[in-house]
């Protein structure tokens, strides 16, 4: 169940209308997770600096139960960075991604935790 937050200092009108849908599809393929379980939040127009400049940048946080091993992160970083380059016009050094592996007991969904739902 990946939960993704994309913060960028680009204004909302510079982010394609269906960006989050296409990012969901990319993550489903790259992470091997069903698209129905992926949540993507876009925070365009964020007051965000990288390297002490206001140059266009995106900072992405991906929280997931699994699919965030060292090998997974290399593959996913390459795919997401390429996607952001094409869709947002960002150079590779302006796409910053963090990956967080979540224990199933720390994720609530459908009225219970994922750990509890997995017991059934």
From Swiss-Prot:
SUPFAM superfamilies for this protein: Tautomerase/MIF
Any Pfam family hit: MIF
Classification via Gene3D superfamilies: Macrophage Migration Inhibitory Factor
InterPro entries tied to this protein: Macrophage_inhib_fac, Macrophage_inhib_fac_CS, Tautomerase/MIF_sf
Gene Ontology CC terms: extracellular space
One function term, GO molecular function aspect: cytokine activity
Family of the protein in this entry: Belongs to the MIF family.
Protein name: MIF-like protein mif-2
């Amino acid at each position: 169940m990946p939960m993704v937050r994309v913060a960028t200092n680009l204004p909302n009108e510079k982010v394609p209308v269906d960006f989050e849908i296409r990012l969901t599809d990319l993550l489903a393929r790259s992470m091997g997770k069903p698209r129905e379980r992926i949540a993507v939040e876009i925070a365009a127009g964020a007051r965000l600096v990288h390297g002490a400049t206001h140059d266009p940048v995106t900072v992405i946080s991906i929280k997931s139960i699994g699919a965030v091993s060292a090998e997974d992160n290399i593959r996913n970083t390459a795919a997401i960075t390429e996607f952001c380059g094409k869709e947002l016009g960002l150079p590779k050094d302006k796409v910053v991604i963090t990956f967080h592996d979540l224990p199933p007991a720390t994720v609530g969904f459908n009225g219970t935790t994922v750990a509890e739902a997995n017991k059934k």
